[in-house]
């Protein structure tokens, strides 16, 4: 009877975690919905264009391949299409729904991990909170920053449960979320005996899930990989002398408290990973806790960080979502397992893991404090560098739509929010494939031999006959208040007062 009771308690532990994750997702979305970054609106513009016109691009009538996360756009596009039952498309509402769903998936994944590893329910709460309260993550809502931890945690759950077919499906969804997440898929697969023994079937399901999109992308758009890889590599100099590898230090100099509460859980995860490796391979433990897939998740985060440092991309803050959330997840799982083991093994003391969980919880609360200190709802993201607030960009974009008509305009350098609200031909490398082709050729010519070869293979089918479109107008940004006609004054928490000026091209 006691054994049956313990089994029943384990199977029902944390059943409320999916609801908790969904509710917390709804709460944070209500807080941030009016302060989305310009890059988030690039994704929303893609989703709107897909739902309304059935086109893959930022602006209608101009196909592009600058959506970093195909799965994010496809999900948002489908949800936006569903919102049309109320009239017009509502991509921001679709984003809210997806945020709630991601929160629920995180809760579900932690509930399953809790059942498999006998984790305390508090570990699941911490695991969800470290994602949904992280200021770096919330500052990039609209991009794939919630989809990444959701799909990676589901992938890990399926590895823990030894389900190779579904692991393959989740692996395919992971690379559709971001192609670079293949790092996690491979590391977790080869580190989990149940998956490794059935590697071919798992790989087959992954290919069946992801290959159709990549085949279409390679032929129709001339590239497996979104053009943003090339664009962001060429923009790395914007942050000079900082790089992706040193980016956390750069952000610490500007937002020290925010960086501490966002990155310290991952640092604890690195320490926990080293401790796990020492205990796992340095001594023979009877019935050692089955943390292998979760350790692989954390190791994947470290390898991802090293890979991005090697690629030479700039330290855009949303690029840290994958390593930070994955290594933080391992920290929670390791400390939770340590605590659970201490309750059944007399040789282990419960105090140290309880302190570790408490410290992790304090960091999650610190993240919440930073979020609340920003003001509710957020007037701007905590980590922010755009020239104008989302509200001001919306005003400028709406007025541009009436002024431009069918004419085209060169982007000032930030295109997402303007394109979303203007629904007009705003041109730059993100929306005009001709400009993207020019950048691709430049990157191939300047890359090292290995990168150049990879890019040549990737862009084998690229239509290089496409030339940049000539704009009818040009929109330019300058600091200070607006002073003349065809200008709009804006304000940004990062840049202060500035203005945009519209001029006719000769």
Question: Over which residues does each language-model region extend?
Answer:
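Membrane-proximal envelope and lipid/glycan-remodeling enzymes
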Residues: 3-506
């Amino acid at each position: 009877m006691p054994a049956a009771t313990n089994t029943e308690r384990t199977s029902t532990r944390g059943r409320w975690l999916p609801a908790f994750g969904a509710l917390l997702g709804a709460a944070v979305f209500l807080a941030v919905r009016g302060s989305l970054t310009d890059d988030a609106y690039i994704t929303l513009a893609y989703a709107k264009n897909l739902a309304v016109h059935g086109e893959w691009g930022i602006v209608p009538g101009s196909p592009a391949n600058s959506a970093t996360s195909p799965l994010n756009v496809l999900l948002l596009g489908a949800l936006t299409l569903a919102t049309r039952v109320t009239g017009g498309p509502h991509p921001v509402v679709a984003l809210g729904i997806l945020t709630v769903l991601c929160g629920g998936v995180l809760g579900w994944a932690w509930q399953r991990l809790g059942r498999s590893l006998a984790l305390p329910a508090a570990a699941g709460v911490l695991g969800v909170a470290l994602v949904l309260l992280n200021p770096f993550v919330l500052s990039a809502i609209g991009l794939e920053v919630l989809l990444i931890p959701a799909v990676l945690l589901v992938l890990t759950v399926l590895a823990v449960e030894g389900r190779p077919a579904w692991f393959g499906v989740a692996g395919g969804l992971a690379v559709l979320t971001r192609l670079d997440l293949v790092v996690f898929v491979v590391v977790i697969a080869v580190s989990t005996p149940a998956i490794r023994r059935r590697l071919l079937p798992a790989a087959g399901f992954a290919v069946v899930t992801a290959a159709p999109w990549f085949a279409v992308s390679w032929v129709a758009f001339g590239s497996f990989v979104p053009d943003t890889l090339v664009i962001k590599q060429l923009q790395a100099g914007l942050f000079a002398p900082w790089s992706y590898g040193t980016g956390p230090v750069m952000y610490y100099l500007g937002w020290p408290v925010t960086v501490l509460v966002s990155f310290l859980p991952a640092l604890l995860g690195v320490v926990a990973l080293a401790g796990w490796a020492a205990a796992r391979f340095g001594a023979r433990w009877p019935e050692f806790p089955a943390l292998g897939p979760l350790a692989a998740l954390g190791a994947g985060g470290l390898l991802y960080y090293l890979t991005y440092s090697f690629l030479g991309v700039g330290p855009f803050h949303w690029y840290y979502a994958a390593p930070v959330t994955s290594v933080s997840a391992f920290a929670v799982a390791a400390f939770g397992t340590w605590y659970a083991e201490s309750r059944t093994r007399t040789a282990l003391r419960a105090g140290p893991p309880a302190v570790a969980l408490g410290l992790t919880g304090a960091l999650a609360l610190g993240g919440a404090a930073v979020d609340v200190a920003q003001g509710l709802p957020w007037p701007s993201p905590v980590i922010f560098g755009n020239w104008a607030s989302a509200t001001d960009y919306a005003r400028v974009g709406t007025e541009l739509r009436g002024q431009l008509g069918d004419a085209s305009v060169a982007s000032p350098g930030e295109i997402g929010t303007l394109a979303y609200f203007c629904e007009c031909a705003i041109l730059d490398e993100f929306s005009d494939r001709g400009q993207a082709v020019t950048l691709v050729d430049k990157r191939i010519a300047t890359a090292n031999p290995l990168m150049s070869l990879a890019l040549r293979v990737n862009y084998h089918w690229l239509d290089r006959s496409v030339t940049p479109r000539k704009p009818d107008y040009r929109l330019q940004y300058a600091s200070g208040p607006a002073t003349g006609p065809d200008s709009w004054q804006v304000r940004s928490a990062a840049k202060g007062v500035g203005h945009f000026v519209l001029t006719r091209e000769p």
